[in-house]
UniProtKB/Swiss-Prot annotation:
CDD domains: TM_PBP2 (cd06261). One of its GO terms (cellular component) is plasma membrane. It holds the Pfam family BPD_transp_1. Coiled coil: none annotated. The gene is ycjO. It is a multi-pass membrane protein. Residues 34-77, 132-135, 184-214, 283-293 are cytoplasmic. GO terms for biological process: transmembrane transport. This is Inner membrane ABC transporter permease protein YcjO.
Length: 293
């Protein structure tokens, strides 16, 4: 093999090796993206026998003039901010607790990540069962046992309580990702740094601010960036839990399949992509994802 490519550029051989991956990437990513952008400029009927109509930027104009879109965008921003902040803080707190030796540490760590590796549909079913107004454990405790309220609330049928629950569900569901990431970097910090800071009279908060925070900052930036992207694109968890919280993913789905407006739905997805791309660019200007500022 060395003789075969001796004295020649490795680029053709590298492209040959990359060709299957590039074809797969083009077929699964590039082509659907181009098709989606094309659809966003069309009025596309569900009946394949009816020809689509080019409408220019009409779908984008309808989005920007639709109060429902702005409401969904605002809900998505709040949802993303709360989930990212909550899951990151909780993941860091649990990681710091586990960054020490104690009995059954590995078993406890496995239990912590259980919510992250369990299929969403199973977790959604468990939550809807717990908050069921007829036989759920939450309403049993609140009504029958503690008498906190007279009548069992319809948790997932009220927009306010539904939003709180989907946020709590997402924090609990996704904090193990932050936990694993932070625990890995915490275990690389030299313990002597904490000992030296303690000898200098630093309290727990000062040790965290001076020693821990600078060490975990690259990982923190990566976790926040990735979780922000993933939560902005969220659909399945919220849609399975309730129909009362119209974040952008749910709003897009309803536009496409409830109202059969595929052109507008495609335009929404393009706008969503632009927002996410802008967030990535702004984040990369502040923090290099490789850990170099």
């Amino acid at each position: 093999m060395n003789r075969l490519f001796s004295g020649r550029s490795d680029m053709p051989f590298a492209l040959l090796l990359l060709a299957p991956s590039l074809l797969l990437l083009g077929g699964l990513v590039a082509w659907p993206m181009v098709s989606n952008i094309e659809i966003s400029f069309l009025r596309l009927p569900l009946n394949p026998n009816i020809e689509s109509t080019f409408v220019g930027v009409s779908n984008y104009v309808r989005i920007l003039s639709d109060p429902g879109f702005w409401h969904s965008l605002w809900m998505t921003v709040w949802y993303t901010a709360l989930v990212v902040a909550g899951s990151t803080v909780l993941g860091l707190a649990v990681a710091m607790f586990f960054n020490r030796e104690f009995r059954l540490r590995k078993t406890a760590r496995s239990l912590v990540i259980l919510s992250y590796v369990t299929p969403s549909i199973s977790l959604v079913f468990a939550w809807k069962y717990m908050f069921n107004n007829g036989y759920g454990i939450v309403n049993y405790l609140g009504v029958d046992l503690l008498h906190l309220y007279e009548q069992a609330p319809l948790w997932f049928d009220n927009p306010g309580s539904s939003f709180v629950l989907v946020v709590l569900f997402a924090i609990w569901r996704y904090f193990p990702y932050a936990f694993i990431s932070f625990l890995a970097i915490l275990q690389t910090i030299d313990k002597s740094l904490y000992e030296a800071a303690e000898m200098d009279g630093a309290n727990a908060w000062q040790r965290f601010r001076i020693v821990t925070l600078p060490a975990i900052m690259p990982v923190l930036a990566t976790v926040v960036t990735l979780r922000t992207i993933w939560m902005f694109y969220m659909f399945a968890d919220v849609y399975l839990l309730t129909t009362k919280v119209d974040i952008l993913g749910v709003y897009l789905y309803k536009t496409a399949f409830a109202f059969n407006d595929l052109g507008k739905a495609a335009a929404i997805s393009v706008v969503l992509f632009i927002i996410i791309f802008a967030v990535i660019l702004l984040t990369r200007k502040r923090v290099n994802l490789n850990g170099n500022k």
